[in-house]
Amino acid sequence: EVMEDAPTVFEIMTAMGMLYFAEKQCDLVMLEVGMGGRLDSTNVIRTPEAAVITSIGLDHTKELGDTLEKIAGEKGGIIKTGGTVIVDGSNTAVMPVFEKICQKTGALLVTSAPEQIRNVVLSPAGEVFDYKDLKELHLSLTGVYQMNNAAVVIETLRVLEQKGYRIGEAALRKGLSEVYWPGRFERLHEQPTFLVDGSHNPDGIRALLKSLRSYFPDKKIRFLLGILSTKDVSTMLQLIEPLAEEIGVIMPPSEKAMDNERMAQQISRECAVRTTAFDSIEEGVRSMIENAEKEDVICATGSLYSIEEIRTCANREFHQNCGGCERL
């Protein structure tokens, strides 16, 4: 029998995941929303132990709405009656949206406090910082925005502890110091520095550029850029231009990818930056590495779709050709 409204691949995967978790009798499961929240297939849980909302930006605007308030309303769909939601405190512009939803549902609203992130030390191995009463937390993820994410994690763990889960400070510190997230301000190499980052919208690019300026002050960056045609390409280019020494253009492996030649032409029209279009990701990675000086910083970004191939090509290129230079 053929269903009139067939489930999507993501819905089938969600159902498979639920079955697997039930069979394994998991004590605690973390479900990540695919897109939005209110209508997402993961949102079948009646009242989770905690709902978590990180920073909100303008992305998937066709599906979720064209303002931060509309997107926040969709994200807020995971807030359930009598539940608890932890929200990144940097979402000040849309916090009233979450407050209104919590008033309506009787949910408890907990916010992180980014302003209480202090005594920050940045290094290639990660970040050290204080948060509220916790001193010298070691975070293995690089990118200054990751400390905001860590603050949300800390508040979430405290909520779970109040619900009876035994976690403890030692486990918290261990988790922060060992967490690994490929493709998020990930350093694949030093001398030259090669970074790969999955930022794919203006807010993501802003966060990436803030981290680049923090880690590499007064330094121009050689970008390897591939973006989907559905994204706000012009705004992303405007943001990147002041920091760019050079832009190499690639096409992400997606039918929605912006054509590399067309994008290179757009960059030439809109930006005063040397630009090269590459026929493949492999060619782009190889060229950027072969033409780099040891002190250069290469940053591959623009799409999550490109990350796996970029990482594979870069690691292979450095392994074959880099001799005595420093690998991570």
Protein language model features and the residues they cover:
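Active-site-proximal loop/hinge segments that shape catalytic or ion-binding/gating pockets
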Residues: S303
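Beta-strand->loop->alpha-helix junctions that form or flank phosphate-binding loops
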Residues: D88-G89, I101-S123, S140-V144, A171-E178, ...
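ATP-dependent carboxylate-amine ligase catalytic core
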Residues: E1-R46
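Conserved catalytic-core segment of NTP-binding enzymes
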Residues: G37-L39, V44-G106, V233-S234
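Acidic-glycine-rich active-site phosphate/pyrophosphate-binding loop
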Residues: V121-K135
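C-terminal helical cap/extension that packs against the catalytic core
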Residues: N91-V110, P124-A125, T193-F194, P202, ...
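Short, flexible loop segments at boundaries between secondary-structure elements
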Residues: P253-S254, H319-L328
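Nucleotide phosphate-binding/pyrophosphate-handling subdomain across enzymes
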Residues: K24, L28-L31, L39-V52, I56-T61, ...
